[in-house]
Amino acid sequence: MERSEQRVRAAWDCDPGKQADRDYREDGMDLGSDAGSSSSSRASSQSNSTKVTPCSECKSSSSPGGSLDLVSALEDYEEPFPVYQKKVIDEWAPEEDGEEEEEEDDRGYRDDGCPAREPGDVSARIGSSGSGSRSAATTMPSPMPNGNLHPHDPQDLRHNGNVVVAGRPNASRVPRRPIQKTQPPGSRRGGRNRASGGLCLQPPDGGTRVPEEPPAPPMDWEALEKHLAGLQFREQEVRNQGQARTNSTSAQKNERESIRQKLALGSFFDDGPGIYTSCSKSGKPSLSARLQSGMNLQICFVNDSGSDKDSDADDSKTETSLDTPLSPMSKQSSSYSDRDTTEEESESLDDMDFLTRQKKLQAEAKMALAMAKPMAKMQVEVEKQNRKKSPVADLLPHMPHISECLMKRSLKPTDLRDMTIGQLQVIVNDLHSQIESLNEELVQLLLIRDELHTEQDAMLVDIEDLTRHAESQQKHMAEKMPAK
């Protein structure tokens, strides 16, 4: 702005008419500055740059005669001063704006308390120079958007050259000042910032500074990957161990369950003598593994055949007479005969050696097993004859063949057609009662079979122990005989 004013001053100094007009303007500016001296002062740089010092020619024209010449010169001058000043300032406006912003930023950075400036304030600062003379300076108003310098017509110009704004009698021309923006609380203030539109900020030393966060330490990715791989390997080992434990426990449970099923179905004891000894009370290993000699193998063969014959006899009993239990008299007679034979054998076997005694016992066992099956059949026939008649025979006396068919559990369709509904209902009820009784009898027989199997296992173990003991005694006796 100083450059533009210097250029305007130089142009007017060259023309005497313009210089006279400038003297007239200077008198008016002095009057305007005296009227606005009560307002806030501006920077000393602008006031000093805009001071007007009259030249020698102007001093000579300050006389009364010179004032008349000034009026006549102004009347003869074609172009008024405001129009000329408008042209010059519009030409140098961009340069003035840049210089003014730099000066304001420098001044705001130097001052701690940045005063707010609002549009419409008259800034005048009295410079304290060496001569002590007071000189007031007024800044030029900001250009309007339409390019006009002054917001009012040239008619508002008075004789002293000042612009009087309507509604503001005490105000001078409005200077162009940046508006201070309000800063939100908590924001950090620093040095000057030109991009903020002339915003005055406190220096870094005056405000609170937010501490910067320290940088994160570097990560060792290789060690982290190794650690993760080790954790995954440990988890896999734990899973494998848990799976092996579950598999072992499930295998044990399956074995136990299979043994229980075999015991419940009754087929566990029908597989041979080895299983008899494996489930014996003493808990010794299987008989087939323990027996070494051919004599013991023969005993196993005999026992196996006996078990087969017993099973055949049981099957024949269940097929023929499931509804009739064994007679207690037959059991007692068989037990008495067994006792008599065992007593006689014990008396006769005392005088024999071990081998001959073993052969004789094996022969007797074979004979008993061979006679067991026909004797069982004869016992079943006797029980059938002693069986009670069906109650249906008493209800149907005129149909004896139906009672016989009921005994045989077989009826023809022609017989059923000849019977009434009541007679058929009686037959159905009788069949239900027989089914219940047969089921109860079957349960009792199964319990007896289990007991007999356990007794058989115990006998086989006893026989094995006795055989081993007898063999050891026989060897001991044989060793003593040559020594004598």
Swiss-Prot record:
Residues 33-67, 123-137 have a biased composition (Low complexity). One of its GO terms (biological process) is skeletal system morphogenesis. Residues 1-74, 86-220, 232-258, 305-350 are annotated as: Disordered. Residues 1-28, 107-120, 150-159, 306-320 have a biased composition (Basic and acidic residues). GO terms for cellular component: cytoplasm. Disruption phenotype: Mice lacking all isoforms encoded by both Schip1 and Iqcj-Schip1 are fertile and survive as long as wild-type mice. However, they exhibit mild growth delay associated with ataxia and reduced pain sensitivity. They display decreased thickness of the piriform cortex and partial agenesis of the anterior comissure which could be due to impaired axon elongation and guidance. The morphology of nodes of Ranvier is affected but nerves do not exhibit significant electrophysiological characteristic differences. Pfam families: SCHIP-1_C. GO terms for molecular function: protein homodimerization activity. Residues 421-455 form a coiled coil. Residues 92-106, 341-350 have a biased composition (Acidic residues). Residues 239-252, 321-332 have a biased composition (Polar residues). InterPro entries: SCHIP_1, SCHIP_1_C. Keywords: Coiled coil. Homooligomer (via coiled coil domain). Interacts with NF2; the interaction is direct. Interacts with ANK3. Belongs to the SCHIP1 family. PANTHER family: IQCJ-SCHIP1 READTHROUGH TRANSCRIPT PROTEIN-RELATED (PTHR13103:SF2), SCHWANNOMIN INTERACTING PROTEIN 1 (PTHR13103). This is Schwannomin-interacting protein 1. It comes from Mus musculus.
